[in-house]
Regions:
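P-loop NTPase Walker
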Residues: 1-3, 102, 155, 167, ...
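Conserved P-loop NTPase-based nucleic-acid remodeling module centered on helicase motor cores
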Residues: 1-39, 66, 70, 74, ...
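Conserved phosphate/pyrophosphate-binding and hydrolysis machinery centered on Walker-type P-loop NTPases
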Residues: 7-10, 27-34, 54-61, 80-84, ...
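Conserved helicase NTPase motor core
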Residues: 9, 58-159, 174-178
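Short glycine-/polar-rich loops that comprise or flank the Walker A/P-loop
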Residues: 16, 132-135, 141-143, 163-169, ...
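Residue-level signature of catalytic and energy-coupling elements of molecular machines
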Residues: 17, 41, 82, 114, ...
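Helicase P-loop NTPase motor core
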Residues: 165-168, 174-241
């Protein structure tokens, strides 16, 4: 069981992770160190990794398995859980308690998931349990998935046609935001990715100006270039634009 205030506060979670980092590395965790370890813990839970799979990741992140276990043990001893644990335990309950599962299925007769490319493997697993009668509508674009470091699982969109009985897949191929020049170049670039649905994107905003390729020598130079462009547009565009 959990105490009423079972959810660990972010400041306490941050201190816990920093303490664990200190014990394993013998030095203070920088903000980057904290973010990396915090993201790794989130990734493990959202991707539902086994102990063996965690050890495979450890090739790139020394002591990850031990630090993850230390983190989980500390939460357990304090009768607390983090946000990701809430999904882990929710999935456990749905799998083990048919009464709870059937009750939720009756309550949520239809399910709509927006920005589905950003959802994780454990979230898709929970959704699949709840949407057992093809009563699911998912809106997403695997081409726009940019949160892999946070365990986004766009592969679930590709598996949608296999996980559900006779699903209807609607491709939205008209772009109302960008000009044809931008859409064409973006499609040429993303088509190199083979893990996607084929699309034939078209623009509703005309041809537009040609896309320019700009080379910079560093990330800082990239930021300065973008800042210069922003300042130029601020000076030249009408105030109402």
């Amino acid at each position: 069981g959990q105490c009423p205030k079972f959810h660990i506060e972010e400041r306490d979670r941050k201190k816990l992770i920093r303490d664990i980092f200190w014990k394993h590395y013998g030095r203070y965790a920088s903000e980057n160190d904290f973010q990396e370890l915090s993201s790794a813990i989130t990734y493990i839970k959202n991707m539902m990794l086994t102990d063996e799979q965690i050890l495979e990741i450890e090739r790139d992140y020394t002591h990850l398995s031990k630090m993850f276990q230390a983190y989980q043990t500390a939460l357990h001893d304090q009768h607390q859980m983090d946000f990701d644990d809430q999904m882990v335990f929710a999935l456990k309950i749905l799998r083990e308690d048919a009464k709870v599962l059937n009750g939720l299925r009756q309550r949520y007769r239809y399910i709509c998931v927006d920005e589905a490319q950003d959802t994780s493997k454990i979230q898709h697993t929970i959704i699949q349990l709840l949407a057992h009668r093809n009563n699911l509508f998912m809106v997403g674009d695997e081409d726009q998935s940019i949160y892999g470091f946070r365990a986004a699982y766009p592969k679930a969109l590709l598996n949608f046609r296999y996980d559900y009985l006779n699903p209807y897949i609607l491709r939205m191929e008209r772009n109302y935001r960008s000009t044809a020049q931008i859409v064409e170049k973006a499609q040429m670039f993303i088509s190199q990715n083979k893990g996607r649905y084929e699309k034939n994107m078209t623009s509703e905003r005309g041809d537009g100006e040609a896309v320019q390729l700009v080379s910079v020598v560093s990330r800082e130079a990239q930021y300065m270039y973008l800042l210069d462009i922003a300042n130029y547009l601020k000076k030249t565009l009408p105030s109402w634009y």
